[in-house]
Amino acid sequence: MEREKLTQTINDAVESLREELVALACDIFAIPTQNPPGNNYLECTAAIAKWMERIGMEVEFVDVPEERLAELAPHGEGLPRRSVIGYLGDRNARPNIHFTGHYDVVPEGTGWSTDPYGCEIRDGNIYARGSADQKSGIVSELIAAWALKKAGIPLKGTVIASATPDEESGGQAGVGYLVERGYLTKESTDYCVITECLDVDKVCIGHRGTLWFEVHITGKQSHGSMPSEGVNALVFAQKLMNVI
């Protein structure tokens, strides 16, 4: 199939899935998955899995063992951490392309004029927590896979879509755990796209990453009449923060 005709066929399939796209988006936008601590993760992954199955994808859940939650999700209050992976085509076929995004969201905060989990649609826009960062990326993954299947595009390999937790707190229990388990490595993955909320013309390579650490700064006490003999730990803490 010629490239232009192929592109048009896929675009037509995407357009035909507009109602499904909105339904999928509102289905998962309505689930409050605030992190920390990591609310409703099992409910959200179950909803995503339902849509994957509707598309015809093979579905797999990847759970962080309970005994490792304190290590990988120290801010998670012991709540479960689960990723969900969908495979379109033979999961072992190569080459493969893995689209991945996170379903956790930061707390909604204040100042909303709409219900942050009400999925209000106005003037062609969906207003909800996660509609940008970053459940919309997961919606894009699934609609792309669905469009390929609906258009009848033969696959030479596998399209993989995953939804992971905990990006907002470092990702160790999410995409980091998929890497640890071998689901997303240079050996198992030919191509990978992180479906973060950038425009289509801003596909980029790399990520600034994140580090969580705890620093202890020790001062030296002194009498108020002889402050020069003491060491103010706050002064050195400020210097450290300026460097960071």
Question: What residue spans do the PLM features occupy?
Answer:
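Short alpha-helix boundary/capping segments
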Residues: E58, R129-S136, S225-A233
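Glycine-rich, phosphate-binding/catalytic loops in enzymes
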Residues: T114-G118, L178-E180, T210-L211
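Acidic/histidine-rich catalytic neighborhood of metal-dependent amide-processing enzymes
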Residues: I126, Q134-R208
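Predominant activation on well-ordered alpha-helical scaffold segments within soluble catalytic domains
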Residues: C26, A49, V139-W146, G176-V179, ...
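Acidic/His- and Gly-rich active-site-bordering loop/insert found
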Residues: E2-I126, K150, P154-L155
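Conserved hydrophobic/aromatic beta-strand scaffold that supports enzyme active sites
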Residues: S83-Y87, C192, E214
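Acidic-enriched catalytic cores of C-N bond-cleaving enzymes acting on peptides and small amides
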Residues: I205, G224-I244
